[in-house]
């Protein structure tokens, strides 16, 4: 679903971060450079794009990571990679934000209303898929790149 969110929004990459107390931990990373993930550092609830979506329980857009003052905590990730913009929607369960689904772009970008609405639907499905996961620790994030997730030859 994370990959599908990326592809349908014409994004370069996408992420699913899980809420773990006051911070978000990477769970699934699709087609993003490790330098970007390392550079954004620990995402606290209420900071950066995903943390603000979780805190506000609504979509959050960062159209240009290099100029948006609300992305200051993650600017190193943008400087250390080609990623420049993103938008995030909260994944809600029982009225609580449990994760954030985000799409990332290589140039300044503002998503369309349909891209946001589609990701909100994906977030509902992800919420259902994550039910019961609260009792297990967040594993190391799963990094995926298109060549690693391509269909087998002959398909």
Q: Model-found features: residue ranges?
A:
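Amphipathic alpha-helical "output/dimerization" segments
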Residues: 93, 97, 111-131, 137-145
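Amphipathic alpha-helical regulatory segments at dimerization interfaces
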Residues: 2-8, 52, 77, 125-128
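A short, aliphatic-rich beta-strand micro-motif
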Residues: 84-92
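Helix-loop-beta substructure at the N-terminus of cytosolic sensory domains
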Residues: 1-27, 37-38, 133, 151-155
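Short loop/turn motifs at secondary-structure junctions and domain boundaries
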Residues: 7-8, 43, 68, 78-83
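Short beta-strand-to-loop transition segments that serve as allosteric relay/switch motifs
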Residues: 100-110
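Regulatory sensory and allosteric helical modules in signal-transduction proteins
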Residues: 19, 23-27, 35-69, 73
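Short coil/loop residues immediately preceding or within conserved phosphate-binding loops
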Residues: 11, 48, 73, 86, ...
């Amino acid at each position: 679903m994370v990959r599908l969110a990326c592809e349908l929004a014409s994004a370069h990459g996408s992420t699913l971060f899980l809420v773990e107390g006051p911070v978000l931990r990477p769970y699934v990373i699709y087609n993003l450079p490790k330098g970007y993930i390392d550079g954004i550092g620990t995402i606290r609830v209420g900071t950066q794009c995903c943390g603000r979506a979780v805190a506000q329980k609504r979509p959050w857009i960062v159209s240009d990571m290099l100029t948006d003052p609300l992305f200051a905590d993650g600017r190193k990730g943008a400087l250390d990679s080609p990623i420049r913009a993103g938008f995030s929607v909260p994944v809600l369960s029982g009225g609580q934000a449990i994760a954030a689904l985000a799409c990332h772009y290589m140039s300044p970008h503002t998503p369309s209303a349909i891209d946001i609405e589609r990701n909100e639907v994906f977030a509902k499905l992800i919420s259902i898929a994550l039910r019961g996961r609260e009792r297990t620790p967040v594993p190391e994030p799963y990094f995926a790149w298109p060549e690693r997730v391509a269909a087998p030859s002959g398909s």
